[in-house]
């Protein structure tokens, strides 16, 4: 978006020739590339390439003796003003009219802009929202399911699907019962219903869960899909290395698989350990456990529980991942705020030009 093609370059060259040393110019750019160009946390190649387009236009102006007073852009959905005591140029991002708020807490407090002659420091003089407010807003992602109900429904469907796949696969696996001395004849839910919620039993269900995957290649492949998908989701960020992105994506995917497994354990405890009990009506009526597991009552309850738990727990985990990965690794800068759909902190600029002065006002719309 910030690249200058040949036709545009010729256009700007034509009008730049009309400038004199008394002229002052407001240079508008589709993207505030000075933020990326001056961020010392990025590598030098990224910084150099980011600034090429706007730097070319700036030189067209300065080579005529004119001065770029303001560089103005939108794109990033917040307000940020950079200024340097050694330069007369103000660099302003005014994207407060965007669809959703973008946080300001990752903006560098100082930009170091390199050109052929020198390195110029630009200090961050004003942002909206303030950085402290921006950091606090991230925590609203703990209510991810509330802010993104459609996506939370998608997560719930995945959780229900995998709970069904794993339980069904265990019925066709010969090694599903690590705890049954008489032979491996029980399903995951039957085994897990007998286990209390303790750390040692969690290790046990991990081994049993792996035994299902190890003997069901299709189930293993399906289980790996969310992990692979979330690795690709993580690699869409720009502020971390590919290896770091891969690790975070894999951890996120494994977190959802582990959570879905724990939810299946909880469902097993409820539906078998508590509802199907030696003194429960189902058992006293002579209904075998396998028949109860395949009854419409249990299947309906199983589907509802998987969907219900997946909606809230899956959304909570996804939101927590966005918060932690952004706070620790500076990842998902866009996603952590786009997930909030925050309509506040809108702003627009009012520019007043007189014979000898340029005034720029940042006006909040709310």
PLM regions: where:
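Metal-dependent phosphoesterase/phosphodiesterase active-site architecture
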Residues: 1-25, 32-70, 76-366
């Amino acid at each position: 978006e910030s690249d200058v093609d040949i036709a545009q370059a010729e256009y700007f060259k034509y009008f730049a020739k009309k400038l004199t040393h008394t002229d002052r110019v407001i240079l508008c750019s589709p993207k505030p590339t000075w933020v990326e160009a001056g961020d010392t946390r990025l590598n030098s190649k990224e910084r150099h390439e980011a600034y090429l387009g706007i730097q070319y236009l700036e030189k067209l102006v300065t080579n005529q003796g004119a001065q770029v007073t303001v560089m103005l852009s939108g794109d990033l959905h917040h307000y940020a003003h950079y200024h340097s005591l050694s330069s007369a140029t103000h660099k302003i991002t005014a994207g407060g009219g965007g669809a959703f708020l973008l946080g300001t807490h990752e903006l560098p407090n100082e930009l170091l802009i390199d050109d052929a002659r020198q390195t110029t420091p630009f200090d961050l003089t004003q942002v909206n929202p303030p950085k402290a407010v921006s950091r606090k807003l991230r925590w609203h992602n703990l209510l991810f399911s509330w802010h993104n109900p459609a996506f939370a429904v998608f997560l719930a469907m995945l959780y229900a699907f995998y709970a069904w796949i794993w339980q069904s696969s265990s019925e066709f696996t010969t090694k599903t019962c690590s705890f049954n001395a008489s032979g491996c004849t029980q399903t995951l839910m039957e085994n897990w219903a007998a286990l209390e919620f303790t750390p040692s039993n969690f290790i046990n269900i991990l081994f049993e869960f792996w035994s299902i995957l190890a003997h069901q290649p299709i189930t293993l492949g399906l289980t790996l899909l969310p992990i692979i998908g979330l690795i690709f989701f993580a690699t869409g960020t720009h502020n971390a290395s590919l290896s770091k992105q891969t690790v975070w994506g894999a951890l996120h995917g494994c977190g959802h698989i582990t959570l879905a497994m724990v939810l299946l354990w909880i469902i097993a405890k409820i539906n078998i350990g508590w509802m199907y009990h030696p003194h429960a009506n189902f058992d006293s009526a002579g209904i075998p456990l396998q028949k109860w597991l395949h009854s419409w009552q249990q299947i309906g309850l199983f589907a509802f529980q998987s969907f219900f738990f997946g909606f809230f727990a899956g959304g909570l985990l996804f939101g927590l991942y966005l918060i932690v990965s952004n706070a620790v690794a500076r990842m998902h800068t866009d996603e952590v705020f786009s997930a909030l759909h925050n309509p506040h902190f809108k702003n627009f600029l009012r520019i007043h030009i007189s014979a000898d002065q340029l005034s720029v006002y940042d006006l909040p719309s709310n």
